[in-house]
């Protein structure tokens, strides 16, 4: 948890996510783990938040962290479970999880999540991109040695998954640089 906060750019991710999901009231975070990014919505009383993950230990920890917040729920489940419950969300968030799965699994997760999206809803995907020559040594070290995901993709590769596998159009795509350190 501490490692992720210090080197994973959690603070900047929260700012980016808050910017794009501001005004949405039913939020689903897929792959929420222990709730690092979920804290973005902690002080928004009008938000109904559900975080899901397949890691039961992480979900139990998230439940403890958010025990005083009635508008927060965490479940150990998969997307198919939510679809069978006919749940709908205004905002769906993938925060640094797709680089841990294959292209076909990422496509499947995105396709399933689109079935949970309410009309005029939005899906936000925040993923690390491979380090480039222009990046400093810290970014390269993190990207090449410390990043645990085995499927870090380029922006174009993510766009191809969305457009080719899902047959969807991307309404907006942007690259935001996030700090690797909490004190920057």
Question: Model-found features: residue ranges?
Answer:
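Class I SAM-dependent methyltransferase SAM/SAH-binding core
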Residues: 34-36, 40-80
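C-terminal alpha-helical "lid/dimerization" subdomain adjacent to the S-adenosyl-L-methionine
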Residues: 125-166, 170-180
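A conserved beta-strand element that flanks and buttresses the S-adenosyl-L-methionine
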Residues: 93
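Conserved alpha-helix/loop element of class I SAM-dependent methyltransferases that forms part
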Residues: 7-24
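A short glycine-rich, Lys/Arg-flanked "PGG" loop and its adjoining helix->strand segment in the class I
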Residues: 107-119
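Conserved class I S-adenosyl-L-methionine
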Residues: 25-33
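Hydrophobic adenine-recognition pocket in adenosine-nucleotide-binding enzymes
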Residues: 97
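Short conserved loop adjoining the S-adenosyl-L-methionine
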Residues: 81-86
């Amino acid at each position: 948890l501490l490692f992720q906060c210090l080197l994973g750019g959690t603070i900047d991710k929260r700012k980016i996510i808050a910017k794009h999901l501001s005004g949405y009231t039913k939020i689903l975070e897929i792959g929420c783990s222990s709730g690092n990014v979920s804290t973005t919505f902690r002080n928004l009383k009008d938000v109904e938040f559900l975080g899901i993950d397949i890691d039961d230990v992480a979900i139990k920890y998230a439940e403890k962290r958010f025990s005083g917040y009635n508008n927060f729920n965490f479940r150990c489940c998969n997307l198919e479970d939510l679809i069978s419950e006919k749940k709908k969300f205004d905002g769906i968030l993938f925060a640094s999880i797709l680089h841990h799965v294959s292209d076909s699994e990422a496509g499947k997760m995105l396709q399933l999540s689109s079935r949970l999206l309410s009309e005029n809803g939005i899906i936000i995907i925040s993923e690390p991109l491979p380090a480039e020559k222009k990046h400093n040594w810290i970014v390269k070290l993190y990207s090449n040695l410390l990043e645990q995901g085995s499927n870090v993709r380029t922006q174009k590769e993510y766009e191809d998954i969305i457009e080719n596998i899902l047959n969807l159009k991307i309404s907006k795509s942007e690259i935001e640089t996030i700090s690797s350190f909490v004190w920057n």
